[in-house]
Regions:
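Active-site proximal loop and beta-alpha junction motif in alpha/beta enzyme cores
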Residues: 1-73, 79-273
């Protein structure tokens, strides 16, 4: 019998039971792919991660699973997994070996207290979305106020501008026809905050409370299209799920987006297999 230890981390929040929950398994060397996938189904969170010994010069190898499949990269799994490592050791820079290469995460401390982390994401490929805007609006249950865009950073995103994300009433069957991992709604900044929502019918996720990969891709798109100036964008997601999540996205010309925030470990346990 083997014992596998894990932590549940609420990501993109400093408040327990908010943000996006993540299961992080430590010491996962030798765990086969089938077992990792089965554990991801068992935890039944949007993502579950497994930390293994590094083989390519990083701090650790990071495997990321949804309940349905392994994925090469996602934002909140990277940040939450880094938080678990940073709580255990006074490290300031973590390099995760992922399916998208080495992802660096800068650890932020204040007076020795862990307060946040900031990852440099893969630079997304961004282009126009060849879709019928009115039809997409009907599928979302809210009209678009501009042209959507597609972005890819290991995950494929459809970025959709709307006046008010809270008014969306998505038709998941219709949205699944767009064949992207995330459909990311965003509304113009108000009082310094940009509101977002994410739907992922292809992955069987009705809604996700915090989506770091989509937030980074959106930030890069908004800078590229002149909607925002270089600097930090604070995105608020998960409100409609009663799990508010604050995602900070730093964008600058010629640089990959940097995405960060805080986390909170809310549970620990073990599986005996």
């Amino acid at each position: 019998m083997r014992t596998l230890r894990y932590a549940i981390v609420d990501v993109f929040t400093a408040t327990p039971l908010e943000g996006n929950p993540l299961a992080v398994f430590t010491g996962a060397d030798g765990v086969d792919d089938e077992t990792m996938q089965a554990l991801a189904r068992e935890t039944n969170l949007s993502e579950t991660t497994f930390l293994q010994r590094a083989t390519e010069g990083g701090t650790a190898r990071l495997r990321i699973f949804t309940p349905a499949e392994e994925i090469p990269f996602a934002g909140h799994p990277v940040l939450g997994s880094a938080w678990v490592i940073a709580r255990a050791t006074p490290i300031h820079l973590i390099g995760f070996e992922t399916g998208m290469g080495l992802i660096p995460v800068e650890i932020e401390r204040e007076g020795g207290t862990l307060i946040g982390g900031r990852m440099t994401q893969p630079d997304p490929l961004i282009g126009p979305a060849d879709v019928d805007v009115e039809e997409l609006g009907r599928a979302l249950g809210v009209p678009l106020i501009g042209e959507p865009a597609k972005a890819a950073n290991g995950i494929n995103h459809l970025l959709c501008p709307v006046a008010d994300v809270a008014k969306a009433t998505p038709d998941m069957q219709a949205l699944a026809e767009y064949d992207v991992h995330t459909i990311y709604l965003w509304a113009p900044v108000r009082d310094g905050i940009m509101r977002t929502r994410m739907f992922s019918p292809l992955d069987g996720i009705w809604e996700d409370p915090a989506t770091g990969s989509a937030a980074g891709a959106l930030g890069a798109h908004l800078l590229q299209s002149g909607v925002v100036a270089p600097g930090r964008i604070t995105m608020l997601q998960g409100v409609e799920m009663l799990r508010p999540s604050y995602i900070e996205v730093d964008v600058a010309p010629g640089e990959a987006p940097r995405v960060g925030g805080s986390c909170r470990v809310v549970a620990r346990g073990e599986f005996q297999l």
